[in-house]
UniProtKB/Swiss-Prot annotation:
Any Gene Ontology CC annotation: cytoplasm
Class of the enzyme per the UniProt entry, highest EC level: transferase
Entry-linked InterPro entries: FA_synthesis, Phospholipid_synth_PlsX-like
The species this protein was found in: Cupriavidus taiwanensis (strain DSM 17343 / BCRC 17206 / CCUG 44338 / CIP 107171 / LMG 19424 / R1)
Function: Catalyzes the reversible formation of acyl-phosphate (acyl-PO(4)) from acyl-[acyl-carrier-protein] (acyl-ACP). This enzyme utilizes acyl-ACP as fatty acyl donor, but not acyl-CoA.
Protein known as: Phosphate acyltransferase
Pfam families given in the database record: FA_synthesis (PF02504)
Domain of life assignment: Bacteria
Annotated coiled-coil segments of the chain: none
Gene that produces this protein: plsX
Keyword set, alphabetical order: Cytoplasm, Lipid biosynthesis, Lipid metabolism, Phospholipid biosynthesis, Phospholipid metabolism, Transferase
Family listed: Belongs to the PlsX family.
EC number, as in UniProt: 2.3.1.274
Amino acid sequence: MTIKIAIDCMGGDHGVSVTVPAAISFLSRHDDAEMVLVGLPDAIRAQLKKLHALDHPRVSIVEATEVITMDDPVEVALRKKRDSSMRVAVTQVKEGLAGACISAGNTGALMAVSRYVLKTLEGIERPAIATTIPNEQGWGTTVLDLGANADCEPEHLLQFARMAEAMVAVVDHKEHPTVGLLNIGEEVIKGNEVVKRAGELLRASELNFYGNVEGNDIFKGTTDIVVCDGFVGNVALKSTEGLAKMIGSMIKEEFTRSWFTKLLAAVAMPVLSRLARRLDPARYNGASLLGLRGLVIKSHGSADAHSFEWAIKRGYDAAKNGVIARITRAFADKSSAAGGVQSAPETEAPGAHPSPHVA
C-alpha cells in the first residue's frame, strides 16, 4: 500500500529549504511513500532542481498561493488566507488525496485550520496535541495535551487517554498501554477537583490506568502514556526543552575549558555520542493532532531537514498503521455500549477525488 503524505512546504522558520529536502530524503528510505508538496510551485521546483529530483516519480506539486506566517493570528489563517499552503495541505487529507499532513507552521493556526477543515471524530469534543518524550526505558513516553486545551473538564482528559491508547497500541505495537494522570502526587486525594474527578473516570474505564504520576515519571517511563490539560502539558514540554538545551550547553562548556578537558572529551566521545543519539531531539520531533477525522502532524517550527524528516515518519507510521480507524473504533465501541452515537466515517482512501490545486 502506498502512503501519500501532504507537506506544507512553506511552513516553519525555514520553509522549502527544510521541508523539500526532508521529503526527498524520506522517499529515499521508504519505497512505499509518495510526497504531495504543497506551496508556491516555483519555490518548490527550485529546491527540487537543487536536489536533482525535479522529475521524481513519487513527487507531485500542489499549488497554494498564500503562506501563513508564524505570527499570523488564527483569524487570518481561517478567514483571509484560504489558499494557504497549510490549509491546502490539510484539505488534501480531507479529500482523501493524502494519508497525513505535515506542517512546521504556526501551531494555533494549524490546530484551528485542521479542526475547521477536518472536523472532530464522533464522540470527541476536543482535539489534543500529543508527542513522545524520551525516557529511561528507551521507547519514550506519549504525553498529551501539550497546549491545545488550557482548561479541560474531567471527561476531556478521559477522551485524551482513549485517543492516546489507540495511537500507542497501533504505532508502538503495545496493546493495552499503561496510562498515568499527571498530578502533584501519587495519592488519590491530591490535585484539583478536575484532576481528582478525571482519576475517578479513568479508574472506572476500560483503560489500563496506572494511577497518578508526577513530572519525573515522564522521564522514568513509569507509564506509556501521561495525560494532562494543555496548560500543564505545555509548561512541562517547554521546561523539558529548556533543560535539555541547558545541559547540552553546560556539557560543551565544561569539556572545552582547557586542553585537558578537551582531551577528556576525546576519550569520552563514544559514550557522549551514544548519549546524544538517545536524547536526539530530532527523533522526537512531530506532535500528533489527535481527535480529528484525518492525520495532522505538527513539526517544530525551527526544525532542520533531519528533524523534519522524523516528523514525516511520525505521520507515515500513523497512516500506515491506521490510527484514525483505531481511534474511531475505540469511541464507536464506547458509544455502542452506552447506546450512543455511531462512529464517524473513516478518511477516504487517497485518490478518491480530483484536486483543483494540482500544478
